[in-house]
Amino acid sequence: MKLRKLGRSDLHLTPIGLGTWAMGGGDWKFGWGPQDDALSVRTIHEALDLGINWLDTAPVYGLGHCEDVVGRALKELKGRRPIISTKCERCWEPDGTIVPRLKRASIHREVEDSLRRLGVDVIDMYQIHWPQPDEDIEEGWSAIAELVKAGKVRWAGVSNFSVAQLKRLQPIHPVAFLQPPYSMINRGIESEIIPYCEAHDIGIIPYSPMQKGLLSGKVTRAWVDALPATDHRRGDPQFNEPLLTRNIALNDALRAVATRLGTTPAELAIAWVLRQPRVTSAIVGARKPGQIAETIGGGRLAIPSDALAEIAKVLA
């Protein structure tokens, strides 16, 4: 896969990055159901063997567990080090209650915890997970700027921020990248965020390009009904009526386009996100060996103009 430069940074990413959210397991509010840690480690190794050069994680995934698993996978690589992206702001109490914090002291504590769990000396890409509390985003961003100067973080970014919030950060420290949700179903960044990032050389690394699996081509009503009780998608409006019927119909239409192109609906969904010049790389989740091999072709697929026009009609 051809590497792409991430905004103003000196990082060059593969068009697909491995998302590890599901590797946090199901024992927390936003889990994806039970997960085998050994399979998670094998999945990380397989993604790197296939050529992916970066992965995205967060402390809150499994309340620290996901970063521990990633750290285990990195240790077993014996020196072969991918680019690591992780986050701060989503803290939790002893009972598992998630609490947003953007105070200087909490962020300095979080970065030390992440460095320890991951087993690394520096975090390549560090970002505020959510802009909450909003009144503290300047303090939180100033703390991350300190971490960059201290050499504990290479490049600083944010996730789920609006243009208005990005503008508040820029005078403190330049934003190198933004991680927003973006897919055929969720296109909210197209009108304002993408143009702003283009104007300010901010790289975009969208998450959920397959809308949590809804655009994988595998979704049926029975598939949704079979989701584990601890899978947070059971409470996602996109996985429930009245939106589910629309999303299943969208899957059927995309499957027809993908078949004509000799690809899969999942790869088509990923390539559609990557068609945006300002998008550097798409975060694609996997939780067991074989899954990333089913989607990695999306990083190489160039969708013909007639197919893009057909997709536009489907999405209209």
Regions found by a protein language model. Name each.
Residues 1-82:
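N-terminal binding-site loop/beta-alpha segment at the start of enzyme catalytic domains
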Residues 24-29, 91-97, 215, 291:
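A short acidic, helix-capping loop that chelates divalent metal ions and anchors anionic groups
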Residues 131-316:
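Beta/alpha (TIM)-barrel catalytic core signal, keyed to glycine-rich beta->alpha loops juxtaposed to Asp/Glu
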Residues 31-39, 65, 69, 98-109, ...:
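Alpha-helix N-cap and loop-to-helix initiation/capping positions
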Residues 33-47, 102-118, 162-168:
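Short, acidic/polar
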Residues 49, 71-83, 116-119, 148, ...:
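Acidic (Asp/Glu)-rich catalytic clusters
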Residues 115-133:
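Active-site groove signature of glycoside hydrolases
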Residues 77-102, 129:
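Structural motif corresponding to the early beta-alpha repeats
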